[in-house]
């Protein structure tokens, strides 16, 4: 802004330089200090502060005492982007040039203001000093209650802006009561108080310019021309209050210039009286509006305006009716009442959800003139005609509005009055009503299209109103009407869909919905309960947001529910619901490629599954299990039902599902090649599986909602999902579930072989349900990226299984055994996959010990999941564990997950029978994987004799070579077999501790080269990020604190980030390297980047040249070394807080323009 402001002040005091001491004061330092403190504390101690400043300003000629708080936006530097200055704005009224500030005031105030403040009166920073036509016109037009203009004498003017906030409503209410109480002289509230309420409100003293009463006539004429816009209201109401302040003061005190000091003493008592007086008033007025009665206003999106509905409470009408001519004195009270009415304000704001941009429409039918929408207009003050298009003199007059709002019998329902809703009957309308009683609300809440009334009323559906044209579009912009809902309007029904965004439902679907008196679906953003059917989106009208219509009763579904199959929804985002029986009928419908919906689609083989389902879809097996049982409603098909379902129908599985697919549990690594189930091919299923769903999946591959690939239509060909992201909680029944085979690897091809066999549809599920065997079924990893048990062997296909396992236990066990042989490592399991791959033990025990078996099974058939991200309980150990004794899996080495990210401790309670020999190293286990090559979690894989079964034992055995262990991999591979290392951690030199290229966790493996973790043995951990208390001095702990005690070859730790107390000379790059370097002779490693306090203990012998010690490094920041006492303290990087503030540069005077607050 220009450095000089145009307004010259009457006192020609020059603006002081920012930090000059005040000239008038003898103690400049203390006064500045006091001012700073008081300005900071001002908001908190406004009452005390005001009195003091008021009295002070009396004494000081300059008026400097009334300095504005530093917190007012004009003075808050960060607000303005300027450097902080203490600016004194004197409270004395200034004679302002008309062209100077006044122009700015008007032009700026008409700019749209950000809707920061709710109360209008707080918004206007400016006072009008000119009471010429322009200012009065804008004042009158802007005053929310138009009380000013009425006081000025135009009672006939009825144009009142819709109060934008409840605050303005309250102003109107207050002014209502004021005519009687004109006698009340409430002297001005000190303007500081106003600024306190609104920091943007400028504490300008009113000017001596002639009272607005002088230009009364002009203002009245102008005001009648301007319909205030809501924004203007908001920005100006503060001005009105200031103006009225001035006039009242003039009247009361007879002073042309009144300072707030005069009335300060009694303000609090006055305010108290005012509040006591006003609270009853406001509640009276609220009662008039019936707002205090238990009327619940249904704010409903009305897709078409209902012209005849008098039930609709129009805010304008209420305001017009309530606003009666008042004295301007009440305006002065506005600021004071804020506290009294804040609660009421909020309530009102909620009732009329006021938003700046909502257009309220007046009742069109009652009042043809009021039909035009009152939009907030941002009009420049100079332009009187700017509003003309919208609100000219033709705006509804007060009488019209009053007539429109006064309760009078509605033609449609003579009984109802507009404002009375309080009876209990009406209150019921706010509850979910069973739709059996004919309520006004259309049955299908969500459709934006005009909904048919309940079947009884179909004849009465309104003829489409012009707004219905909009309805054809999928998203119609609804009008907001607040209408208390009354049941009784017989002639017309309001089409008031609740807020729902749904492509228009086809008429038949709507009618079906209407017939079934469903409770109105309320807008919920949670996973829909399973009872709700998936959003019915017809394929022809896909929409991004699908509605979840409440699920019909099974009977109804069977009767007539042609709801679009969930699979069809192209992009449904809604919660998944198991599809109803109808879908079975719809099997033909092609599924959409990308449904984000949790669509529980019972897909027939004919339907292609969604390619890209993001929701947790309870994929039903192709045979509609649900059709058989109502249990399906729950989304859980009873296993019996599952068995009932047609086993053979091949169901194409979605190639990739992101949701938990209720369908095939990717997890059934148990399946042996024998089982013919086709693992679902979801490449990427993310869905969570319901237990029943898992059964279903066994019976039929549920398409995983999120398959990335096209589902293979032929079950035979379906490959295990390449990338299943399922969050499936293991079904107890799930043993039959086929697990999506490996995701990433060729294994998918194997699975295709498996796929040939269609998963046994019904019987397996039933078996599973019957037996605990479901427990046996390894829940495929909860977040199985690829269900690790891609190993479902072809034999294990589910079709066979249903045949094999008429009794679920036997079947499951058999399958699992077979599967265990075949269990393919799941390429990418992200969830905690308890892969009890074999479940062999479970076979005999299946029902008895579902969970424990799982753990043991895990041992047996852990497919090595190349990428298990969850705690994959891969008991990599083979099937020998199997209770059956079928060791088919045993021959398998359980592959360790290549990338297990989770807690990959084979949870098997029993140690794997097969010892480390089978344990494969997971190249990348991110969780605790037993000897994972890559464990990212705490891998306590102790391969003692159990083989790689991740014994939960925390003992740090011989480290497996986890290339990437990111967790604490306590993999003490005791077994000589796999690990060259001696299992005891004491062994300093376990042969090649597993060289964990990247161990990020506490790697207690005796000598893992734990790159990132604390590797106790000193492996050459390029990147040890944790405490590496490796006894082996040679182990370079790259990133962790190396406590290499050995002085000899300290690991050259490229990057130790933690305090490395290594006796070794390791130069901890980033940590506090207290390398005591016992042999002082050893050159301390030059730590390029010590970020901690690096105090090399023996500074004398080559102190490490810490290039960049960022901590409290005894050799301070850039010292070459402590030894060089003259060492140049290199660059001083004081990054901490320096409290020194430099003075502003002497030359610059930053004049803060008075008008800047209007920005």
Swiss-Prot record:
GO terms for biological process: mRNA transport; protein import into nucleus; ribosomal subunit export from nucleus; RNA export from nucleus. Residues 1-28, 44-77, 106-125, 183-273, 426-715, 746-780, 794-1159 are annotated as: Disordered. One of its GO terms (cellular component) is mitotic nuclear bridge midzone membrane domain. It comes from the Eukaryota. The gene is nup124. To yeast nucleoporins NUP1 and NUP2. Keywords: mRNA transport, Nuclear pore complex, Nucleus, Phosphoprotein, Protein transport, Repeat, Translocation, Transport. This is Nucleoporin nup124. It comes from Schizosaccharomyces pombe (strain 972 / ATCC 24843) (Fission yeast).
